[in-house]
Amino acid sequence: MKAGKVCGETRALLQNPVVEFHRIEDNSGGECSTHKHSHKWNGFFIEEGEMEIHVYKNDYELVDKTILYAGDFMAVKPGEYHLFKANKDTIAFEIYWPELLSEDIQRRSVGKMNA
């Protein structure tokens, strides 16, 4: 589903109970609201342009600012306020997934190199 936003547009490409995948086009200077997701990680992959992510950390008073360029990826933890803004016209993908997937591996053995 395609939807307009104040800073561009977003299109949900996949939405189900376990993952969401959105394509966003943000105009240079566009900035989203400061917000948080209670249970979902929020990942950003930049296809084209430049996007600045501000993360308001829960563990300390500083705001982490990361500038992403084409090919870069970063993720914001659940419960952390954040915003993104386009420093240039930007095409990006947002990926959302729940915290419960983080520790979903149970190892029965240890990896090794066979001769």
Regions flagged by a language model, labelled:
Residues 39-58:
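Glycine- and acidic-residue-biased ligand/ion/polar-headgroup-sensing regions
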Residues 57-79:
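Short acidic-glycine-tyrosine-enriched beta hairpin
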Residues 3-4, 83-115:
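Double-stranded beta-helix
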Residues 32-34, 44, 53-54, 75-76, ...:
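Short beta-strand His + acidic residue motifs that chelate non-heme Fe in jelly-roll/DSBH
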Residues 29, 48, 89:
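ATP/adenylate-binding site constellation spanning eukaryotic-like Ser/Thr protein kinases
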